């Protein structure tokens, strides 16, 4: 396959670059109240409710976490406390990258401008970005776009801010549901799926698969 050389490479941040450990936070809160099987179900519910919470009008991510955690607790017969949701939210900016990320990003950043499009709050995202070990041309948040991915509005905001179109981008994500399905529908032909085990492969959406970010330089011929 010929190398892809886009004008920009855009990335999902949480999960793809940052080790987004919502599951670990939930285990810390409720692991002593739920057995292993019930805890796994709780984590699946918490993840599903987070996706559901971002589908409508934009709201602060603290509210997304609060509502989705509350719903997961209700579904699993666990007592919910407001302070538990606040604890989870405050952990987000403390999380760092997957081990493969800094070296792979740094190599690509020397040749192609890197962009983040993240379901993040302005007050939190730079604490994560600073841990990535590579320079970013631009960092765009759901708060700025007033929409969370997978809503098209988030991607369209990025296009408008960069002054480019889908044909100019290579979009990189570990998630089909949040990123790659929307990228496909919006005409981003060049996509990379980072297989971090979050979701199963879905070849319909047309992408290059890599195991981790160390494989990205090869995709763009570096």
Annotate each predicted stretch with a short phrase.
Residues 2-99, 110, 121-123:
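N-terminal helical cap/lid subdomain that shapes the substrate entry/recognition surface
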Residues 1-9, 102, 106, 115-222:
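Asp-based, Mg2+/Mn2+-dependent phosphohydrolase catalytic module
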């Amino acid at each position: 396959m010929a190398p892809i050389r886009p004008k920009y490479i855009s990335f999902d941040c949480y999960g793809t670059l940052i080790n987004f450990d919502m599951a670990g936070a939930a285990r810390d809160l409720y692991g002593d109240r739920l057995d292993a099987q019930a805890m796994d179900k709780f984590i699946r519910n918490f993840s599903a409710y987070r996706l559901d919470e971002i589908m409508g009008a934009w709201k602060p991510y603290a509210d997304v976490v609060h509502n989705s955690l509350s719903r997961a607790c209700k579904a699993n017969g666990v007592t919910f406390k407001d302070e538990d949701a606040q604890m989870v939210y405050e952990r987000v900016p403390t999380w760092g990258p997957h081990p493969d990320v800094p070296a792979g990003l740094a190599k690509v950043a020397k040749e192609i401008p890197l962009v983040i499009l993240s379901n993040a709050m302005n007050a939190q995202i730079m604490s994560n970005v600073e841990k990535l070990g590579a320079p970013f041309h631009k960092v765009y948040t759901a708060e700025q776009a007033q929409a969370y991915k997978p809503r098209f509005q988030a991607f369209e905001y990025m296009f408008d801010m960069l002054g480019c179109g889908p044909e100019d981008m290579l979009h990189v994500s570990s998630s089909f549901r949040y990123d790659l399905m929307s990228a496909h529908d919006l005409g981003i032909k060049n996509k990379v799926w980072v297989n971090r085990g979050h979701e199963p492969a879905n070849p319909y959406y047309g992408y290059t698969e890599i195991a981790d970010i160390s494989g990205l330089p090869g995709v763009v011929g570096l």
